[in-house]
Design a protein with these regions (language model features):
Chain B
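Short, intrinsically disordered terminal tails adjacent to the first/last structured region
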Residues: 1-4
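A structural signal for multi-pass alpha-helical bundles of membrane permease subunits
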Residues: 6-8, 12-280
Length: 289, 280
């Protein structure tokens, strides 16, 4: 019996060790480095207290990034959520065509961000060879690549990311909707509920746990978003699509101000941690298991 | 009365079909444009990217394969993804077994730790890890990057495996114990065969994530020889801006295998997405 207990600790060890070495210890190092002027090379960086944080809080671009992340969050908790819910509800009644639609909706989600970004960059947004170029040069419309204007770049990048993402929500919402107890649906139909009432009083309460968890996940990942921004604009033009993630990345690998990069990363993590607490609180039922 | 009801229902049905078709097209049209233009040369793409190819330039594909060094790239992608899958399968199935049965004292603590680890930004550990890896001479090592992606994908895999283990009735384990099975026999002989669909689901979800990963891969893999297919593909972008036919052919080389693979494993992939997200 005693042996069996010890074996269980042995079984969890590989996971803990892997996560410890690659996530936790480097994560704690980031925490330390954030208070130093480390450049990535120096053997003994000097401790500079809160200076990194002071400097980023005084940086206009930091606030611009934070504001962009906030805008990104608002776009992501609305547009793909509405599309996902709408398509999931419509698919609920399409028993035969349902799986075909699901597969098609997931195509962009399955593909790599690198492929999706290059696809939009080259064949849609490109002012010479893309659809935008065709509309401009051949049809004489006065448009430019939405990625090149400070007013539209953020929305253009978000559109591509949303294009790739919403199908995932459709599939998740549809699976949750299908778990709604049949007797509740029948009862509501007998009471004479119309479609909207059926959704509001039966389906939505039933998917609410899933809906809330997904909302929290969307918020967390909106503050971490990197791939599409970095690939499509690199944060430009004129920092109009700069995110906390690209802001930190530039410090580390272009300016070699690793201390500063670490302080931005720490700030991101704290934002994420707040949302994580919400996530853990929402999935507390899992913890009881 | 009856007529108008069914008329209303019918128009509603047409509308709902129209909406679904519209969204299906929004997913498919950009992908079709890539396929279409992969057979054209730069001149005809610039003239009209929406037109049918007049002459078919199949050579775009051979040129793209060479230019992106896809031969090397796909081998590296397979090595990297394989490393990630093996590590995750081994670690996550054991951890999932332990956490599902609440078998250790710190179950709750470990669960919370992995929940936080799942939502932590990669940037939190990327920078120190990068400079440590550089010191160890592991930049450009696809296996090392496979291990890192294993750690990144581990939490989700653990939670998926945990839910698969939780579906196994407790009595099965108890009766095996009474028959005198050791933990090792229990796991390899009874549990693992029962969670085989779970192992497949985790491999597919984690495999696709590792295959597509960008931030970690592009940071750690430097030097042409260590490039994955994705990185080789991205390296075309600056050089071949004026040869969109080649770019589009390279895109098809990236897209087609993944879509075919997805269609083959769709059931497991969708199961994985859903059981990671749907809360009962």
């Amino acid at each position: 019996m005693q042996m069996r207990k010890a074996t269980n600790y042995l079984l969890i060890a590989p996971s803990l060790l892997l996560s410890l070495l690659i996530v936790l210890i480097p994560g704690l190092l980031t925490l330390l480095v954030a208070f130093t002027d480390w450049d990535g090379v120096a053997v003994s960086p000097s401790f500079i207290g809160m200076q990194n944080f002071q400097e980023i809080f005084e940086d206009r671009i930091f606030w611009k990034s934070l504001f962009n992340n906030a805008q990104w969050t608002i776009m992501f908790i609305t547009v793909p959520v509405v599309i996902g819910l709408l398509t999931a509800i419509l698919l609920l009644r399409r028993k035969r065509s349902r799986s075909a639609y699901q597969l098609i909706f997931l195509f962009p989600y399955v593909l790599a961000p690198a492929t999706n970004a290059m696809l939009w960059l080259n064949i849609i947004f490109n002012p010479v060879s893309g659809v935008v170029g065709y509309l401009k040069n051949s049809l004489g419309m006065s448009i430019t690549s939405p990625l090149s204007s400070v007013h539209t770049a953020l929305y253009a990048v978000a559109s591509v990311d949303i294009w790739h993402y919403w199908g995932f929500l459709t599939v998740v919402y549809l699976a949750a909707l299908r778990q709604t107890p049949g007797d509740q649906i029948e009862a509501a139909q007998l009471e004479g509920c119309n479609s909207w009432q059926l959704f509001k009083f039966v389906y939505f309460p039933s998917i609410k746990p899933t809906f809330s968890i997904m909302l929290v996940m969307i918020i967390i990942f909106s503050f971490l978003t990197f791939d599409y921004v970095y690939l499509l604009t690199g944060g430009g033009p004129a920092h109009s699509t700069e995110m906390l993630s690209t802001y930190a990345y530039t410090f580390a690998f272009s300016a070699f101000q690793v201390g500063k990069a670490a302080s931005v990363a720490l700030f991101m993590s704290i934002m994420g941690l707040l949302a994580s607490c919400l996530y853990i609180w929402l999935s507390k039922n899992d913890l009881k298991g | 009365m009856n007529n108008s009801m069914s008329g209303k229902k019918k128009s509603g049905s047409i509308l709902s079909h129209a909406v679904l078709i519209l969204f299906a097209l929004s997913a498919l049209l950009p992908l079709s444009l890539v396929l279409l233009n992969s057979f054209k040369d730069q001149k005809s793409i610039v003239r009209n990217p929406l037109s049918w190819p007049e002459t078919w330039h199949f050579s775009n594909y051979a040129e793209a394969w060479e230019a992106a060094n896809f031969g090397r790239g796909f081998i590296n992608s397979i090595l990297l993804t394989g490393t990630t899958i093996l590590i995750v399968l081994f670690a996550a199935s054991l951890a999932g077994y332990v956490l599902a049965g609440n078998r250790i004292k710190g179950t709750k603590f470990v669960t919370v730790y992995f929940m936080v680890a799942m939502t932590v930004p990669i940037q939190l550990f990327l920078f120190p890890l990068y400079f440590v890896m550089a010191k160890l001479g592991l930049l450009g090592n696809v296996f090392a990057v496979g291990v890192i992606l294993g750690a990144v994908n581990l939490p989700l895999a653990i939670f998926l495996m945990k839910s698969f283990f939780m579906n196994i009735p407790r009595e099965l384990e108890e009766s095996a114990r009474i028959d005198g099975a050791t933990t090792r026999q229990l796991i390899t002989g009874i549990m693992i065969p029962l969670v085989r669909p779970g192992l497949l689901t985790v491999s597919i979800i984690v495999g696709i994530a590792a295959w597509n990963e960008f931030l970690v891969t592009s940071t750690f893999l430097q030097g042409q020889n260590s490039f994955t297919a994705t990185l080789g593909f991205l390296s075309l972008n600056n050089t071949y801006n004026t040869n969109q036919g080649l770019m589009m052919a390279a895109s098809v080389i990236m897209i087609a295998p993944l879509i075919i693979f997805f269609l083959i494993v769709q059931k497991y992939f969708i199961d994985g997405l859903v059981s990671g997200a749907v809360k009962g």
